[in-house]
Amino acid sequence: MKNLKSLLSFLFASFWVAIPLIALYACACAIATFIENDYGTSASKAIVYNTPWFNFLHAYLLVVLIGTFINSKALERKRYASLFFHSSLIFIILGAAITRFFGVEGLMHVRENSAQSSFESADTYLNITLNDEKKLSLKTSLTFYYSKRLKPIHATLDHKPLILEPLEIYKQNAIKKDDATILVLKATYNGVSRKFNLIKNNRNEGVEESEMFKDDKLSLSFGSAYIELPFQIKLKRFELERYAGSMSPSSYASEVEVLKLDNTLIKPYRIFMNHVLDYEGYRFFQSSYDMDEKGTILSVNKDPGKIPTYLGYAMLILGALWLLLDKKGRFLKLSRFLKSQQIASFLLALILISPFTSSFANEGQIDMHGGKSAKIERQKIENPANKEDSKSAILERLKRLREYSKDHLKAFQRLQVQDFDGRIKPLDTIGIEYIHKILRKDDFQGLNAMQVLLGIMFFPNDWRSVKMIYTSNKALRKLIGTPLDESRIAFRDAFDSRGYKLKNLVEEVNQKSPNARNELDKDALKVDERINLVYTLFSAQFLRIFPSDKTTAWLSPIEAINSPNKEISSVATEFLKNIFSGFDDALKTNQWDKVEKTLKDLSVYQQEHAKNLYLSSSKVDSEIFLNHTNFFNSLTLPYIFLGLLLFIVVISSLVKNTIPNIWLTKILYMAILLCAIAHSVGLILRWYVSGHSPWSNAYESMLYIAWASVIAGFVLRSKLALSASSFLAGIALFVAHLGFMDPQIGPLVPVLKSYWLNIHVSIITASYGFLGLCFVLGILSLVLFILRKQGRFNLDKTILSISAINEMSMILGLFMLTAGNFLGGVWANESWGRYWGWDPKETWALISICVYALILHLRFLGSQNWPFILASSSVLGFYSVLMTYFGVNYYLSGLHSYAAGDPLPIPTFLYFLVAIPFALVILAYFKRHLSLPKLV
């Protein structure tokens, strides 16, 4: 009996089982993401996510979690904070189970002035109809096309047995993201057997096939089933807004009515992005639309597991805060240990405040809602540059533009423009924003951004043939018809005699849900946006420089010319005549007086009519200063160099068992402090210029991570911590300037206008900073382990201090990563109707949570070498974060292009990034024997 009790305790209440289970769970999720990448979503669900063994793994984890609580006597030991925090996982798992087994989701297609009382399920069914009357839907997991063990399905129809024997199931084509499937099966009914070839398309819609079984007609389809609703949704009107001068959609909405089944009106409603219809437990989200714009596609969701799941999320966040403040908790025990080591730790106060004061989100995009007319009536203005010219004349103009305009850009740079979000900014900023987005860099052929902008505006015909629009996908370049080895295309390349070459592709991509888009789709949308931006520059729709007395909206030239206000129309016409003729003359004679006078007159007009919107001279100067000083990028090398130098100084003193050179350490300390002050000034300057806290996009989030890292190093008052944080700050700034993040100052409202999204991204991004610090501290610890010798007790003391800092940083990073990930689920559920969809990005975030949870619980296995284990695992565990942040985009979603393509080459430095830490772990292993004292 005692042995049985011990066995049960081991199997259901032991960390020796719980930790391997977490590792197994993380590995299963990781494998599933690669299966999805190679074979599609249906394959990953059939092999992992929707399987009984994966469901069992969740249940086993839940039982072991409860059993471990009971076995550890957490309640008797008054570990209330830990009990409350971990209990949240019970509610989250139970809520997910309720959603998984009892929730329904699908799509509803409604045409204008018609109503629907059913929707198509997201799950796959075998739909059976007997004699066009009796219907039966059998839920099936026949979705993986390599399955060889297909089991027969038995059912009863009209009191007669029906046997369905799947013979074969395979994909219709080789495209990864295309789940179009053919199911071959044999149906036996009424003593007769017939063979069916059932086709399911990429939208999970089945094509019905019929056969006669003696006197009975049996119809089968493989795909969605229709789920009936107790009410109707009627579409009154579908609205689609497009970007000015293009066919690309910017937003869409459905005006609907909720009706009873007898057509009695219940209520009208407007459904659009992030504005959901809730009725009788069902939620309706705007998903897509018909090509003729006369119908809408709504995502439908009914989730009975929402309440326990949300309760679990709330408990998790509150429990995390409680654990950080609990005197009996690990975090404050580590803090007290650090104080005993004469290291002041105010890290907790810094981090608990900093992430919640930020609200940065995804990269901002330019929202082009300008004039409705795309045709600027330049024929009214004699512009010599508008005429077609020879190639030599064009090259000569470009040469003069490069040479003559360089010293006369200031007046253009300071000209104030209102962007499409209503923000007033200097034209210099507009130029950098637009040109950076079009080119993916800030200069081109010896021209800076402002010169490129002026060239496009004043000589549009010259620039229609210039290959400047960046593309990243060879398949897209093949579609457009440009050389595959040239990453840039010309505006003219995107058009032929039939019109815009990307029109159909962009329309198709916008029909897809975001998680169904492949790399070709994503690049098509980006290139489409760049082409729209170039067109906006050609047509001067962006040049909103004429203030209106009646509204706060400024007018573009065409809007001003066509304005009923004769004063504005006259000013705009005169300005355009003078500026075009003056600019053309300036490039011929290098005389800029007329241009500068015209711009000065316009500035005076703006100041008189814009009132409070007109920017002060200091704010304009500050913004232009930020645009051209490359402020934050200049701090990258100093941060890295000073951090490494301080590390070498400290390590050298430890090896020699001497005190570090006081003057040298003070100089390095002051140098890093000056960098931090400059960093802070830069952030404050961005704050002043933008009018809001500078955490509005991904670029600024990296600036924030770098700043928080270096400040944390100062607060900890440890030379090693400061060297690590300085190095990490430099790396963060390096990543921010790699070229895939737009550095422009954007509006506070993100592209996806959601408060939850702000919180989600801010907390998760901040967590990466702390887990990155764990990586650096782990490397430091391993190096110190390698340098250990008898008699170097100060080395051991330093390792223990770093270990405590490392564990505290990891606790904070894990809490923030977990809270941020689940809050992202809240945003997704409130915006799209699904808080978890096993998307590779969110799955790898979950894997990272599992990895760091596993690391922090390894100490419960009773090892005596916790500092070494923590150092090694904090280094190796960081690869899960790198996979989440970079790997998912480049080696899962972006591994192949649409239908074909070469794998993305693995950079050489990546091999060293993996090999060096592993080598350090192996070398440190031989000197691993060091225990952390008991914490009180």
Show where each model-derived region lies.
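Soluble non-transmembrane domains of integral membrane proteins
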Residues: L107-P304, S359-F625
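Internal alpha-helical transmembrane segments
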Residues: A46-Y125, I297-F346, S358-A361
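Membrane-interfacial, low-structure loops and terminal tails that flank and connect transmembrane helices
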Residues: M1-S9, L334-L347, T658-W663, R788-I805, ...
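Hydrophobic cores of alpha-helical transmembrane segments in multi-pass integral membrane proteins
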Residues: F15-F34, P52-G67, F84-I98, F285, ...
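Short, hydrophobic transmembrane alpha-helix segments
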Residues: Y39-V48, K73-A74, I651-P660
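Bacterial N-terminal signal peptides
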Residues: L347-P355
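Hydrophobic alpha-helical segments
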Residues: M1-Y49
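Membrane-interface segments at loop-to-transmembrane junctions
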Residues: L11-F12, K45-Y49, R77-F85, F337-A344, ...
